[in-house]
Amino acid sequence: MLLVVFALILLGGWWYYDLQMAEIESLRVPGDAKADLEIAKMRLETVRATLTVAAGIGAASALVLSFRRQQHDEFHSTQQRITELRIQAVEQLSSDNATIRIGGLYNLERLGEQHEELRQLVLDEICSYLRRPFDLVTSPPADPEREVRAFAQEILQRRLKRRIGRRNYWSHNRLDLTDAALGVVDFSDCRLRNVNFTRVRFNGPAKFHGTSFEGPTSFTGVVFEQLVSFFDARFDDQVDFKEAAFSSVADLSRASFSGAAWFTKARFAHEVNCSLAEFREYLGFTGVAVDGYANCSGTVFHSYANFSKSVFAGGADFELARFAGVTIFEEVAFEAHADFETVSFGGWTSFARSTFRSSASFEHSVFKESTVFRESAWNWRASFLMVHFNATVDFEGSAFLDDVSLNGALLRQLLHDQSLPGRYRPVETSKGFRFLWTVKRDGSEPVVPQRRPGDAELQLRPGGPELRSGVESV
């Protein structure tokens, strides 16, 4: 520091002296003795002034350097004090006294509020506390630890709200709650980044209304003991619900999934509501068991959707859904009514080896690419009323044990006769192959829908599929 001050004095003094001497020399008049005397006096004054300026520069430099040293010392002192406070707060979290533990959480929150750069560390400490083993199921209601954990959750929920303003929102890079035991949770309207809820047990209702999940999100192996709602939630990256257990109603209505979503081997013990949800990337719903009613009406699947080997025990409603990519329902068991009415299948679709143990309806739906129902089993009524197959459809090896309705269905391309439900014959028209009758299981007279202008007049003889009248252009 002394060398810096000395260098500043020399440079400043030299610059000032050189500038003044140049101006004095410009006043010299050759042969004028009086002028020479005045110049000599001015040189002397310049020397004195230079020394004064140098001294001033030295004093100012010393003052600045002293101020910076003071700032440096104060910064280190503050950092040391912050470290001490953080250590003290963390130590309080290990106290046997619940009141002291709550005080430690309060002190951590205050540190994060006053020092923005510490907020991630504070969130890490709070998450670490919630990851400590604790059984909310077997612990008595009066256990003071319940109050401590509820306060820790409340800090997270309060500080991560989007609507509290930019200054009050705690920006973060991660939230790791792996194996945590949580009570009643409300992360509604929060913005959560890189959240890890792996194997978390939610022992109370969990609300994520309008929550924004940024970065990869994991709910792998999570257990929701009570109702959980992701209504209008936004997942900006991939999300993983593999082997998740939903013990009560699950609401994912209007949720938006911008990245891949995995629900592999998840278990829904009650109703699941995915109505009006949107899946923009791959959806893996394989090996899933839904014991209650599955409502996926109006849901949009922009990419590959795979429901293979899943079980829908309480009914499945996909009415008005839209599948834009490849859709797989292979080896799926529909134990109750399956509703696929007015559905748009935009890509290759397969229901191969699936079982419909109750009624199934695909009325007014559109299959834009090839469709496979090969080796499927239909135990009750199946309706394809007014369905449009814009490419080939394959029912080969399928078993229909009750009535099958293809009234008004339109098939653009014929794979081969054996690919259709038993006892049906395709009738070629100007627009494609039409089916305007219903075949009864017992071979009785079919029910023919009321003829509309342009429809073909087709009937079946009892006991056989032969035509009784000609075909008009359609």
What are the roles of these predicted feature ranges?
Residues 1-58, 260:
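Short hydrophobic membrane-inserting helices
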Residues 40, 45, 65-66, 98, ...:
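Short alpha-helical segments used as structural interaction elements across diverse proteins
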Residues 75, 83-92, 96-102, 106-109, ...:
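N-terminal leader/targeting and pre-domain segments
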Residues 18-19, 57-81:
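Transmembrane signal-anchor/signal-peptide helices with a preference for the extracytoplasmic
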Residues 26-40, 71-95:
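Membrane-proximal helical linkers
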